[in-house]
Amino acid sequence: MMSKQLTAQAPVDPIVLGKMGSSYGIRGWLRVFSSTEDAESIFDYQPWFIQKAGQWQQVQLESWKHHNQDMIIKLKGVDDRDAANLLTNCEIVVDSSQLPQLEEGDYYWKDLMGCQVVTTEGYDLGKVVDMMETGSNDVLVIKANLKDAFGIKERLVPFLDGQVIKKVDLTTRSIEVDWDPGF
């Protein structure tokens, strides 16, 4: 007899889209924290995978809703608080193939992490360790190299394509910027 399981048992190129929070109520609901640009977009990408004891597991989203400031989810087969508590802090993962193709000049934040940032004059500013959304534009959070000539530990560089960001090369994991290394 054929099983009805989907073929995807594990993501080939896993991408974390969020995390499950604490349980809510007694019927297996969980808070969910989304790291997608528009928080609700996390529900557009299915199936979700989680890792339990080093093993990938596919979970099925049954329902979700807003509750006060939180979003809460109900997963299939998670029917009480104890089952929900086992999933607290699990990362919600999808396969990168589920994400939309980007336009030229657009990048997923995850692809910029760890990139080396160098000025157009060749000064090494450090590595991208985080991204911030400021409303007007995204900002690269760059951890400076240990012996930074300017004594700077962290730099915030606006991700303004063309103006500040001159070239992004994901193959060599480098970003060229027009930026004063003294900032």
From Swiss-Prot:
GO terms for molecular function: ribosome binding. It is found in: Cytoplasm. GO terms for cellular component: cytoplasm; ribosome. SUPFAM superfamilies: PRC-barrel domain (SSF50346), Translation proteins (SSF50447). It comes from the Bacteria. It holds the Pfam family RimM. Coiled coil: none annotated. Residues 104-183 form the PRC barrel domain. GO terms for biological process: ribosomal small subunit biogenesis; rRNA processing. Keywords: Chaperone, Cytoplasm, Ribosome biogenesis, rRNA processing. NCBIfam families: 16S_RimM (TIGR02273). HAMAP family: Ribosome_mat_RimM. An accessory protein needed during the final step in the assembly of 30S ribosomal subunit, possibly for assembly of the head region. Essential for efficient processing of 16S rRNA. May be needed both before and after RbfA during the maturation of 16S rRNA. It has affinity for free ribosomal 30S subunits but not for 70S ribosomes. Binds ribosomal protein uS19. The PRC barrel domain binds ribosomal protein uS19. Belongs to the RimM family. This is Ribosome maturation factor RimM. The gene is rimM.
